[in-house]
Each structure stands twice: as structure tokens, then as C-alpha cells.
Amino acid sequence: MDEIEWWEFETPAEMAQQAAGDIGFVIESAIEAHGGARIAVSGGSTPNVVFGALLANKEIDWTKVTLVPTDDRLVGLDDPLSNYAKLHRLFSGRGAMIVSLIDETALDDYREAGRLADERLALLDWPLDLVWLGMGADGHIASIFPGPDLDRAVAGPKERRAVGVRPDPMPANAPVDRVTLTGVALASARAVMVVITGAEKRDVLESAIGEGPLSQKPIGRLIAEIEVPIDIFWSA
């Protein structure tokens, strides 16, 4: 684990403005350095306010940006539960390339879906310029959950960038299998940021960081493996 810096804000709106500014800086720096930016983007509801601030930035050349969901539900690409669908709706009109983790021929086989996603990701240039993570109240990140798939998703085969997982227990709001970027893929990024809200999630994150590589919370396991500075954006 490298340096961790906390950025604290009174409101989610203030946090979103700062986070969007930092994401924009990473994008512009990556475009200047190697002609394009590759960003892994968290699902969930917290990123929505950041998306608005990002889209208001008229300086970003989205035609040179590739967006990859950190994870996705094993549903059709136009399903309301699809992270790809949200990114496509928001950013494809700006010219960004959106990479899907889901192959609709494998919706009934999460392990095959993970293999196909891994093949697709191999076509990208690695490492990613930025991994933008959220976190669940149980400490899960992307679709790396506590439970039977934790070790395989966090520290599985080093050559795998994506795997299929079956959360146990299934989340009540989206009881479906998932495909997720692996801990190896996430930890290899040039920059990492975590964006969370609320006192409960802050307590979970601080506890997981303190537990280090032995943590049973996915976020703790992942942070212990990251070798670049981590920026944590938090608001009440």
C-alpha cells in the first residue's frame, strides 16, 4: 500500500466538483502523454453527481477517452441494471468509446461471461490511467464481494483482468450474476480514487484499511495491493 490522502467535503455536490476536476486532469494528462485516456468507472448511485460535473467540462476531448465499467450485471446491454447502458447513454454522444464487459451470448453462464470479458479487455492498452471506485456498505468494490468468490476475484490468476462472479448472498436490489475487473487489473492502474459518502461507509473503509491484506473486506484487500497513491473523496 502506498500513500492514502483523504479529501473531505461538507456536501456530495462539493465532492463531485473536486472529483470531476481531478478526473478531468487525469484524462487531459493521459491524452497529452500517450494520445488517449483509459478510465475504469464505478457503478452504483454515488457516481451520478460526478458524471454531471464531468459532462459540464467542455475542455475534455471525449473522442480520445475509453471508459470501462469496473463491473457489470449479467443482463442485456439495454437493461436498466446495466452499467454499460448508463455510460453509453451519458458519454457515447460525446464520442467516448464505451467497453462492455457483457457478451449477451453468455448471460446464463457467469464464468464463461468472465472469460469473454477477459478476452475483450486484452485488446486494450494496459495499465488503465485511472480506476475510479465506489464501495458498498459491506466493503465490496466493483463486483468483488465478501464471500466464496473473494479470493478468485481479488488475487486470482495474474493474467486475468476480468472474472465472472456470483454474489453470496445476492444483493436484493440486483439479484443477478456479475462480471468484474479483477483486483490485479484494478491495482495496476496509474492512478486510483475512491469516492464514498456517509459516516457508515467511512467507518467501514477506515477499518478495512487498518486490517490490511488480511482484511475480509474486498476494499481492504485491494488497497493493500495498490502501489500508487490513493485519493479518497468523502462527504457526509
Predicted regions located by residue number:
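Ligand-binding beta-strand-loop-alpha-helix segment within the catalytic cores
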Residues: M1-E3, W62-W132
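N-terminal glycine-/serine-/threonine-rich phosphate-binding loop
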Residues: M1-I39
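Glycine-rich N-terminal segment of FAD-binding domains in flavoprotein oxidoreductases
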Residues: E28, E32-A56
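Glycine-rich beta-strand-to-loop/alpha-helix junction loops that act as flexible
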Residues: V41-T46, L133-A137, T197
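A glycine- and small-aliphatic-rich helix-loop capping segment at beta-alpha/alpha-beta transitions
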Residues: A53-W62, A85-R89, P146-G156, E211
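Short, conserved loop/helix-junction motifs that constitute active-site signature segments
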Residues: K58-T66, A153-G156, V184-A189, I223-E227
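Class I SAM-dependent methyltransferase SAM-binding "motif I" and its flanking Rossmann-like core
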Residues: A137-G183
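ATP/nucleoside-binding phosphotransfer catalytic cores, i.e., glycine-rich phosphate-binding loops
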Residues: L181-V184, S188-A236
